[in-house]
Amino acid sequence: MVEQEGLTAKEIDYAFQQNENLGSKETSFLIPEDLQSPPEKRFNLFLRRRLMFQRSEHSKDSVFFRDGIRQIDFVLSYVEDLKKDGELKAERRREFEQNLRKTGLDLETEDKLNSEDGKTYFVKIHAPWEVLVTYAEVLGIKMPIKLSDIPRPKYPPLSYMLGAVKLPSSVKYPTPEYFTAQFSRHRQELFLIEDEATFFPSSTRNRIVYYILSRCPFGVEEGKKKIGIERLLNSNTYLSAYPLHDGQYWKPSKTTRPNERYNLCKNWARFSYFYKEQPFHLIRNYFGEKIGIYFVFLGYYTEMLLFAALVGLACFIYGLLSMENNRTSTEICDPDIGGQMIMCPLCDEVCDYWRLNTTCLHSKFSHLFDNESTVFFALFMGIWVTLFLEFWKQRQARLEYEWDLVDFEEEQQQLQLRPEFEAMCKHKKMNPVTKEMEPHMPLCHRIPWYFVSGTTVTFGMALLLSSMVSILIYRLSVFATFASFMESEATLQSVKSFFTPQLATALSGSCLNCIVILILNFFYEKISAWITKMEIPRTHQEYESSLTLKMFLFQFVNYYSSCFYVAFFKGKFVGYPGSYTYMFNIWRSEECGPAGCLIELTTQLTIIMIGKQIFGNIHEAFQPLIFNWWRRRRARTHSEKLYSRWEQDHDLQVYGHRGLFYEYLETVIQFGFATLFVASFPLAPLFALMNNIMGIRVDAWKLTTQYRRPVAAKAHSIGVWQDILFGMAIVSVATNAFIVSFTSDIIPRLVYFYAYSTNSTEPLSGYVNNSLSVFLIADFPNHTVPMEKKDFVTCRYRDYRYPPDHEDKYSHNMQFWHVLAAKMTFIIVMEHVVFLFKFLLAWLIPDVPKDVVEKIKREKLMTIKIIHDFELNKLKENLDVEYGNIMKNVLVDEDNSLKAKTTV
């Protein structure tokens, strides 16, 4: 190219580029070329640059291409790699982007010079109408064909009392209800297409684009066709791939196009709206059904927790009101009863004898949770969990109808082969469905990986149990230290009634256990992902199911093992004075206090549950906030106006494919705390309720402000988590029955009340004395007797054994067997009663409500009728056209024949 006078070659190229991008109104200010002198040419170049700069500044926060018309549906980012494989990555990108263009997608690249860090390229992707309609048909996306004549569900009676909780109708139902049908290009006239630009929601658009990206090839390497954006992301060919948020979350859109992100932030992600219902339809429209159904489940679970929390709070208040009048605590606190009972030492040698009334306050606290209401609450929660799951099935069925998921088929991305599986496969096999050859891995090749996986899982479980044993050893070893220290320190005597050695050990052990749990969680997440990867699952769905099972098993053992120990093992295999059981022949087994072990289980459960919730909420809220602040601080060097929309989203945290996985896992673990051991802690549902109320808003705030927009995906249920919840519901019936029988003191009190009490006016009078056996101090072995000699002849301990003057001294007496029989009877009766109710309720409550069945039938009927009428009218039009053409041809032939006769 010959250089123009006064301009360099670069300036000429730049001028041509700008002329192509400027509009007619903008170029009207330019001096005509035939009148240009060198200074005027430079003025034109300056003006072009200034106009383009202003346009660039104006469009930096835009979600459109430079033309301001084509919407950005997806963004890819990358940096040039100067290493030896940089050329290979560049070639992959060229091939990939070329193939994307062949599918019909529009691409526009932002040069690295326009980015904040000066090294990142951004590829903006737009799906034109033809691409959208083609893949909408491929994916079977349902779109509206007619306004529905089925009325929306009405609020129940007395709903006006919940006016403050309800959202405005325009927010709750942002769009009308329609009859829908699977989209078809050949029936476009059937669908309610008012504007092609807004017909497909942004969530549907990014879902279609991601489907294309996940199946687009980028070359052939080592004789294998390489496919999909995920493989390119794994190899760092691209840094990221994400759909754009609608706009800024703190201000509405300046255009007529609604800013759904702002609407969500305003009506959902505000912490001041914690008492409001959630805008589920807005969530679904913006994030897709998969994320939407998670928030529906979390909201429903929180609503149901309200009933459990109220009943649990009532049981706690009952325990609080009856605490002072409790006969057992009264006898323990009485100086003439509990003050005269000398208890055997709680550890060997260093521990001294002690009086029963020193545990007065401890016994009162124990009564808060160990009272008659415990049995009622255990039965109630067994029925509550059944109602929760059965009504969730109905809620899920209603959701399937409202969100057009009735004929849902699993997402293609979930059923697509994983790149890692394809890379490891050397064999191929005919797919009986698609009739195509697919990569196949024989079972004999999988067995070694399954063995490695099974071994690792077993080792992980053993490590978890060993950590629990280590904490148990800590509790055993530190108990004697606490006991001797509190006994010897005169300054601690005043607090000894409040802070007993048992309580000190329980608190310190629970706090240590909570810390260990949180640390092990971090490692087991990595281990579970590594093990699952080693198994080489075939599809993404198989990968998620396998990972879910492993993570749940690890978390189950990690969080609940210590609670199972306190509930079912502590104090059950202690022995008796003179014949105690020892762990590793060193540490004496832990004993329960005179009021039982239930208060220790409550302490353990409270610390772990609340500690986990506090840590989880702080981590969820502050981690993305700090990370995003740091990334923005490093990246942004110009004013906010020049910080482009795609760069703003690029600097947000990645939600990832497993984002929902961790949310479900956290909810299921919390569900376990609220059901498995709820008989020991009736306030657990209340704490879970408070956590969820704020947790919903934290999750909403994260998704709308701190994370990149996730790719929309469909789901019609919560998947494998529903089976896990059903399993935990069944286990919870057994655990609560065992807690009431073996951990609480209710059954022994009832046995004494009905079978052994001799006081008709106060049947529980004398229960404390009856529950403590007598031991002759002279029978202590030398290595266990306290160093400090006392004048006592006997001491008491918690068990049902014969006294030292009996011929079967220290053997279990008949009352022990009566109590044991009563405990087993209670377990059998409670389990059968609860399971009977469970099966009866499951039978009475249909999985799909009757009105939903009728609505589904109505919609199917109307859809078939509308399509039938459309096809019939189309056929008539075609027949009319064909008939007209035939008649026209007949008339022409007749006219020609008449002309021929006239000529003859």
From Swiss-Prot:
Q: What else is known?
A: The term 'anoctamin' was coined because these channels are anion selective and have eight (OCT) transmembrane segments. There is some dissatisfaction in the field with the Ano nomenclature because it is not certain that all the members of this family are anion channels or have the 8-transmembrane topology.
Q: Which residues lie on this side of the membrane: Extracellular?
A: 312-371, 475-502, 570-667, 745-825
Molecular function terms from GO: intracellularly calcium-gated chloride channel activity; protein dimerization activity
**Disulfide-bond pairs as recorded:** none
Q: Which residues lie on this side of the membrane: Cytoplasmic?
A: 1-290, 393-453, 524-548, 689-723, 847-904
Question: Under which name does UniProt file this protein?
Answer: Anoctamin-5
Q: Which residues cross the membrane?
A: 291-311, 372-392, 454-474, 503-523, 549-569, 668-688, 724-744, 826-846
Q: What is the native source organism of this protein? A: Mus musculus
